A protein has these predicted regions:
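Non-catalytic linker/capping segments at the edges of enzyme domains
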Residues: 1-57
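HotDog/MaoC-like acyl-thioester-processing domains
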Residues: 2-25, 113-114, 124-167
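Hot-dog-fold acyl-thioester-processing enzymes
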Residues: 15, 61-87
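Short coil/turn motifs at beta-sheet boundaries
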Residues: 39, 51, 98-100, 114, ...
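Hydrophobic core residues within well-ordered beta-strands of beta-rich domains
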Residues: 42, 101-103, 117, 136, ...
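Soluble, non-transmembrane catalytic domains of enzymes that act on hydrophobic metabolites at membranes
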Residues: 43-61, 67, 73, 139-143, ...
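Residues located in well-ordered beta-strands
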Residues: 47, 106-108, 120-122, 141, ...
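Hydrophobic beta-strand-centered segment that forms part of the acyl-chain substrate-binding groove
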Residues: 88-124
């Protein structure tokens, strides 16, 4: 991996995020729009609170629909939250010349959770990007409202150049 680089042109996602930050409830509107594009994420009712190159933070309320049979926050709901944070961070960080897709996830369940959840995805730097596909492992921590680390995930993103647009 190389040192931090300036993104040559912000992604469309990051441009929209930055525009909406000037409005009341801009992050809620943005999060709602993300869930329209990728509906499965709406199952955890996420709110993206931080989105910038190399970092994304997402919060989700402790709702009955996110519980398991024990009455605690479901492990797979935490995975959903982690994947959203990792994907949004990757999208905000990559130059517009490249695309990404998650191809793997490893998860450690560290503690039961019965509160609102907070996922943080961050990387120190991006790999060198060129004409060949590459992998980026995005670490994500999912914590409870009191800061207890409940889930640690590593999500592998396949990054490749965007194909040329047809004329």
């Amino acid at each position: 991996m190389s040192g931090p680089k300036a993104v040559t042109a912000p992604s469309a996602t990051l441009k929209i995020w930055n525009r909406l930050q000037h409005f009341p409830f801009g992050n809620k509107i943005f999060s709602w729009a993300v869930c329209l594009k990728a509906p499965y994420f709406s199952s955890v009712h996420p709110t993206i609170t931080v989105l910038q190159p190399c970092r994304c933070e997402v919060r989700a309320p402790n709702r009955r629909g996110s519980h398991n049979h024990l009455g605690t926050y479901h492990a797979i709901a935490s995975c959903n939250l982690a994947e959203l944070a990792a994907g949004m961070m990757t999208d905000a960080t990559l130059p517009t010349t490249h695309r990404w897709i998650p191809v793997g996830m490893t998860v450690q369940y560290l503690a039961k959770a019965g509160t609102d959840m907070h996922a943080t995805a961050s990387v120190d730097s991006m790999p060198e990007l060129g004409d060949e596909p590459t992998a980026l492992v995005v670490p994500v921590q999912v914590a409870t409202a009191d800061g207890t680390l409940a889930v640690r995930a590593e999500i592998t993103m396949h990054i490749s150049p965007r194909p040329p647009r047809p004329s």
